[in-house]
Design a protein with these regions (language model features):
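P-loop NTP-binding module
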Residues: 1-297
Length: 297
């Protein structure tokens, strides 16, 4: 039995078994990958402030796979996103309360959560009737904002700190159709308190309600590293925990899950897992370059 299966078994034993016919809140989604960019052109030109999505720069940062891995990993992300979308929009199952607010976290740094956040966003925006807002919720280490070159732009913390600031003014379109980005914003010594505030709840409710077909994906700080991530978990409707295969210990996975509400769906995503389905070896979450860069923080 794997480390992840052991963690889930212990957690389910402590929290009670799942009722017959009910989907467990603690699914193992055993893969990560990337989606290919849409081939068709946008119906209209992108806005002037649209954030450029430089694939070469993102690959160099370890946040996109190399071209030769795209097809295999794209298929894996299709498997990952489906239950997330179904819970968010109530497709084939009752919608999860605030299920379109999805937090992507890890127990500790180096698991690949930022890689997961970006590539899940790119895959999900390919849906015909779904748009995506990717939020840099790692206000301690806003790597996504830095890589996209918007680390100095007002963002999440600013709009929570200043109620007079329009939410729409800090949501930035990107050059990728169907994908927008909300930077982390300017750092704050009381970031945890801001994320746990009533104002934060108001902000995420507005983000969730503006477009019923929008998924809001939060790239969060590691759960066991900061208190900011635990505050962010309070407003998310569903949570994905990225676990690096062969490295993350069982007790860390279990400890991370224990910080979360029992009432929210929590899924584990096994990252950098080598499998051999249909004769292929897949390695998830790695840049794939010689020497193997980590897939993000």
């Amino acid at each position: 039995m794997s480390v992840i299966e052991n963690a889930i078994k212990r957690l389910q034993a402590s929290r009670g078994a799942t009722a017959p016919g009910q989907e467990s809140a603690f699914d193992v989604l055993a893969s990560v990958g990337s989606a290919r960019r849409r081939d068709t052109a946008a119906d209209s030109a992108p806005p002037a402030r649209a954030i450029p999505i430089n694939q070469d720069a993102l690959r160099a940062a370890g946040l996109l796979p190399p071209p030769h891995q795209e097809r295999e990993l794209a298929q894996q992300y299709r498997q990952i996103k489906r239950p997330v979308i179904n819970r968010a929009l109530g497709r084939g199952m009752p919608a999860v309360p605030q299920g379109n607010l999805v937090m992507i976290a890890s127990a500790v740094p180096g698991e690949g959560k930022t890689f997961m956040s970006l590539n899940l966003a790119l895959s999900t925006r390919l849906e015909e009737d779904v748009t995506v807002l990717l939020v840099d919720g790692d206000v301690v280490n806003p790597r996504m904002s830095q890589v996209l070159g918007v680390q100095d732009e007002p963002g999440l913390l600013d709009v929570v700190r200043d109620p007079s600031l329009s939410i729409a003014s800090v949501v930035l379109p990107t050059e990728v159709p169907g994908l927008a980005f909300l930077p982390a914003g300017r750092p704050s010594d009381n970031a945890t308190e801001l994320l746990a505030s009533v104002r934060m709840h108001q902000v995420v409710v507005q983000l969730a309600s503006e477009d019923p077909a929008r998924l809001v994906l939060f790239d969060s700080a590691p759960l066991l590293l900061t208190t900011e991530s635990q505050a962010l978990a309070q407003v998310a409707g569903q949570i994905l925990i990225v676990v690096r295969a062969g490295q993350t210990s069982q007790h860390l996975v279990f400890e991370a899950i224990e910080t979360l509400s029992e009432e929210k769906p929590v899924s584990l995503v096994l990252n950098q897992c080598v499998r051999q389905p249909h004769g292929y070896y897949y390695q998830y979450g790695s840049s794939g370059a010689a020497g193997g860069k980590p897939s993000g923080t």
